[in-house]
Design a protein with these regions (language model features):
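Ligand-binding beta-strand-loop-alpha-helix segment within the catalytic cores
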Residues: 42-57, 126-199
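Generic structural signal for well-ordered alpha-helical scaffold segments
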Residues: 74-86, 118, 122, 155-159, ...
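Glycine-rich N-terminal segment of FAD-binding domains in flavoprotein oxidoreductases
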Residues: 86-123
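Short glycine-rich anion-binding loops that position phosphate/pyrophosphate groups of nucleotides
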Residues: 108-109, 139, 204-207, 213
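Class I SAM-dependent methyltransferase SAM-binding "motif I" and its flanking Rossmann-like core
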Residues: 209-224
Length: 224
């Protein structure tokens, strides 16, 4: 027997064991609709949503080494900030109420990128005065000045070496009292409003910012 859901929205019901003929018919139908054709791709209108996501093609660049990858990403970040400033700034007077919003990821992976951005800043290629940053995550409870903090290296390797305004640095506060965490998380989400460009890292299991595979795509900042 198998557990099935009533199409009319009623209670779950127990269905009888399907016949061999029905099973073969079902397999034939699934093979026709849900298998990848030889020429690649899927018939999207016939495939379940999870299969579409599983086989979707995401444009990906693979580099010989970290240096080449860092150069490519740094080029795109510098270009995006410059273009934004050309639109929102004139005569070097910045619209500080509307800075370029850069999302930062934590961990070891982006450190080479952060060092490259610092290098370019010191060479005069880019200014971060009209940039606001939002960090992806943080341990709890902890202070960002502690070496175990997820954001300690962001300060030491990046933020402390550029001309970003202190009020434009947004890091999840790991010192908020536990009974106020939910309220704080909601306010953090509200303060973000938008992200112009996000630097993101993906873990070995596919996790992003402590969001393990299977997390809701519309989930909010929260304690996990």
């Amino acid at each position: 027997v198998r557990l099935v859901n009533d199409a009319n929205g009623g209670d779950n019901t127990i269905g009888s064991k399907p016949t061999e003929r029905k099973i073969n018919k079902l397999h034939k139908r699934m093979n026709n609709k849900y298998s990848l054709p030889k020429d690649g791709g899927l018939i999207s209108e016939s495939a379940p949503r999870d299969i579409i996501h599983r086989y979707e093609k995401i444009h990906t660049k693979v580099y010989e080494n970290e240096y080449e990858g860092v150069q490519y990403v740094a080029d795109n970040i510098v270009k995006a900030i410059r273009m934004y400033n050309e639109i929102h700034c004139s005569n070097e007077v910045y619209e500080e109420s509307q800075p370029f919003v850069l999302g930062l990821t934590t961990g070891r992976t982006p450190l080479g990128l952060y060092r490259e951005l610092v290098k370019r800043h010191h060479e005069g290629q880019i200014s971060f005065r009209n940039v606001a940053v939002y960090s992806l995550d943080e341990f709890y409870p902890i202070r960002s000045t502690e070496q175990q903090s997820r954001n300690y290296r962001i300060h030491e390797e990046f933020l402390n070496h550029i001309d970003i305004l202190p009020e434009n640095v947004h890091i999840p506060d790991g010192t908020v009292p536990e009974d106020r965490v939910s309220e704080y998380c909601a306010s953090y989400d509200h303060s973000v409003r938008r992200i112009d460009l996000m630097i993101i890292g993906v873990g070995e299991d596919g996790q992003i910012g402590f969001n393990e595979p299977g997390s809701y795509s519309r989930s909010r900042t929260r304690l996990v």
